[in-house]
Amino acid sequence: EIAKEQYNTKNAKQESLNTEGKRILVVEDNDLNMEIITTLLEDYKIIVEPAYNGKEAVDKVKASPPGYYDLVFMDIMMPVMDGKEAAREIRKLPRKDCQELPIIAMSANAFDEDVKQSLESGMNGHLSKPIDMRKLEEVLSQI
């Protein structure tokens, strides 16, 4: 009974967020972390597109039509191009949607200075790893 009640509560929350069909670019170089966040987001009927480093993320945003992505979850420490540099590059793209696209840092580093640096690079917020479901839902409620 308790498990059933928790399941029903989870489903009600997912439906109330109205995220079905939203498209999120998840930028994460660690396969296990990518799998975890993808599974969490797919539970909300979100379309997840993966990128495995910052350069790949910038290239995907560049190649996409305006308004294609609803949100970007961006790891910070990655090879090739880190998340902060990728956020700066996305913000420089000459498209209005690239200035407005929500970019949320995902990082195990959650000190005030880390959050400040993420925001200074053009990101809109910061989620600490491991992902807190309440905070994830707060972010998802805004797309």
What residue ranges belong to the model's regions?
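C-terminal catalytic ATP-binding subdomain
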Residues: 1-13, 44, 134-143
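A Lys-centered signature of the CheY-like receiver
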Residues: 129
